[in-house]
Each structure stands twice: as C-alpha cells, then as structure tokens.
C-alpha cells in the first residue's frame, strides 16, 4: 500500500515522502494516528496544498521539544525508595515512576517519553535516564535514587 507521510516517522521517512508499506501497518497504525494518508491522486493534490502548513507545524513541534530538552537536561530528580543494606531496592523504579517524579518537579513528562533500555532500575545511586521527546530530539536527565 502506498501512503504519503504527514509527519516524520522513525525508520520509515520524512514529511511528504511517498512510501510503500504493508497494508496492516497503514490501516492499524499510520492512518488512525493521522501520520499518513493513502496516496491517491486527490490526496496527493490536497497534501501539496497543505504542505507548508504541515512543515510549519512540524517545525513548531520540534522547537517545543528542543526547549523541553534544554530544561530537562539540567534537571536532577531525586527519588526515595525502600532498599536493603547493600543498596538493592525492594521493587524497582520504572518509566512511570520517573515520569511522575519529573512531572511533580514541574516539568510535564509522559511515561512513553522515558527510555530505560536495560529495564527498570533496581539499585540506589545516580543514573542518566534517556528521554525521547521527538523523533529528532533526545536528551538525558540525572536521576538519583536514595534509600528511605
């Protein structure tokens, strides 16, 4: 199925690209989320008419994400958790806990924007947590886990 991308999609293409993808990916993900439209002749013409508007909106989203990244990169968040004598936590700190702590500090953050490639954090100490705010904008914030 051939579609026109209405925004940048990771591992697929940029705004305005015509890409050939599997039908299920288009019907179940890209089309319902408004990230693409079917590449018919009238949709191509409609897209070209709206191209400048879509590019401006994409640039604004990226600028907003870069501003958030600048704020978050300077942020140090401290979380308290129950831990044993050797610093091993009773439980773990996951993406939801980190997002809630950052949001409580006054910087709204969604759980889906937090990246923990090695899984949940299970020890006390300092950690650099990756935050993915936009397809082109990624930053890290410092997280300190202390025993309560």
From Swiss-Prot:
N-terminal signal peptide: none
InterPro entries on file: Ribosomal_bL9, Ribosomal_bL9/RNase_H1_N, Ribosomal_bL9_bac/chp, Ribosomal_bL9_C, Ribosomal_bL9_C_sf, Ribosomal_bL9_N, Ribosomal_bL9_N_sf
A single cellular component GO annotation: ribonucleoprotein complex
One Pfam family this sequence matches: Ribosomal_L9_C
Entry GO MF terms: rRNA binding; structural constituent of ribosome
Entry keyword set: Ribonucleoprotein, Ribosomal protein, RNA-binding, rRNA-binding
Residues spanning the membrane: none
PANTHER family in the record: 50S RIBOSOMAL PROTEIN L9
Role description: Binds to the 23S rRNA.
Protein family according to the UniProt entry: Belongs to the bacterial ribosomal protein bL9 family.
Protein name according to UniProt: Large ribosomal subunit protein bL9
Organism of provenance: Pseudomonas paraeruginosa (strain DSM 24068 / PA7)
Higher taxonomy: Bacteria, Pseudomonadati, Pseudomonadota, Gammaproteobacteria, Pseudomonadales
């Amino acid at each position: 199925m051939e579609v026109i991308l209405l925004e940048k999609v990771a591992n697929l293409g940029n705004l305005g690209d015509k890409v050939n993808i599997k039908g299920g990916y288009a019907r179940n993900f890209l089309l319902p989320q408004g990230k693409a439209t079917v590449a018919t002749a009238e949709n191509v013409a409609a897209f070209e008419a709206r191209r400048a508007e879509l590019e401006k909106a994409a640039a604004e989203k990226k600028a907003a994400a870069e501003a958030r990244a600048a704020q978050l990169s300077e942020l140090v968040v401290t979380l308290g958790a129950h831990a044993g004598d050797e610093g091993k936590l009773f439980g773990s700190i996951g993406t939801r806990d980190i997002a809630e702590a950052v949001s409580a500090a006054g910087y709204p953050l969604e759980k889906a924007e937090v990246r923990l490639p090695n899984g949940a954090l299970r020890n006390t100490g300092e950690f650099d947590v990756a935050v993915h705010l936009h397809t082109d904008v990624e930053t890290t914030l410092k997280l300190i886990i202390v025993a309560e």
